[in-house]
Amino acid sequence: MRAEDILAPTPAGVCCKRGGFYIDPTRPVEKALITHGHSDHARAGHGAVLATQETLDIMRLRYGDNFAGTTQAIRYGEELKLGGVTVSFHPAGHVLGSAQIKVACEGVTIVASGDYKDVRDPTCAPFETIQCDVFITEATFGLPVFRHHDAKGEIDKLLRSVALFPERAHLVGAYSLGKAQRVIAMLRGAGHDRTVYLHGAMEKITRYYESRGIDLGELELVRGAKKSELAGHITICPPTAMGDLWSRRFPDPVFAFASGWMRVRARARQRGVTLPLVISDHADWDGLTSTIAATGASEVWVTHGQEDALVHWCVSQGLKARPLDIVGYGDEEESEFVASDESLSIPSPLVGEGQGGGVS
């Protein structure tokens, strides 16, 4: 059996006709298997959705209770028969609940990675290498120039700046799902026990992470805090908020941005970032190539990102490779713009909730 007889790229995403499903479809379909909760992979409007419990919960937080006709949760490692194929979900190390999807049929095994990283993250299960015949990999940072710095060193750089400028506020642009919580957890791991402030747009998902047992220490909402109270503290906010009037209410703010794209100095300058933090939730070039080799796959399909460069590398290693050229996937580190939605869905309020005045 050929891999193309099991999975095939279509305008709506990777389709498994034998199983009657799509993986991370880019438009509404009858049955969708979703790798993780970022909006370019997890869309509302499908007839049925199969995903990890965390991904389903995150979709519900973002889209409301009726984001799909029906939903089904699957545990890591659990096998499920769908039509003529067997599927299972395995940790991808990208964000909480993120998964690779393994599809097996008549002796052929295909693994769709979704977005992934191969470095430790205290807020989600680590990436699991799965042996397969065909590996479908992302390529967000699929160029040799992208070699991410050690994330711990970037956190140390942030803390040195806070110590050097105690009279200033530090605003860290980070995306609401995954990056924000990872940065906070790494700050705690580095011994930073001071209150971390949150923009209101970060609250729902950060609360959800805490409800799943992830300890993020003392957090307060920015609204209700006096300007003087924010000096010497770190505030986590959507990247777009750093250019808003909102940011002018902080005392002489230092603008930081946690993203793999901060490896490109021009992007940092364009965003007015004075403290770029190269912290990514995607594998860098070395992570992509080492992961491909570790899977033992003889064939690699490359999607969303720098497809051609990674295909070329695979061919140079004697592997069969092709780009999938599916339109509709982006990169949350570059294009996700979080609205300032301060509506609440989970109990156990953060310190500072409901206080009047101050910054929101």
Predicted regions and their residues:
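Conserved beta-strand scaffold positions in the cores of enzyme catalytic domains, especially
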Residues: 22, 32, 49, 71-73, ...
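Short coil/turn segments at beta-strand junctions that form active-site/ligand-binding loops
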Residues: 47, 108, 166-169, 192-194, ...
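Glycine-biased, low-complexity coil/linker segments
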Residues: 352-354
